[in-house]
Amino acid sequence: MNKQRRAKIESEVLAAQTAIEALRFALQNLQDLATEEQECFDNMPEGLQASENGQRIEEIAQAFESANDSLSSAIDDAESAIEEIEEAVNQ
């Protein structure tokens, strides 16, 4: 591998790491929103929890949680891929 290609790879790895940091920030914000929605549902009286609006809030909280899990997994996979690239380049 020549210096020019190595520099390009390092630049792209840095860009990917920056994107991952942005995703982590977004993930934290989504987790905060999921917590807020779940707390909203949990603080409702049982009668309201069973209402259409209560069920909708619970569904939204669950959707946020599912999305958070998927995004977290994707971030972990991306970090692993970057580590593999760095190891290959530095051999």
Protein language model features and the residues they cover:
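Long, low-complexity or tandemly repetitive, helically biased scaffold regions used
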Residues: 2-91
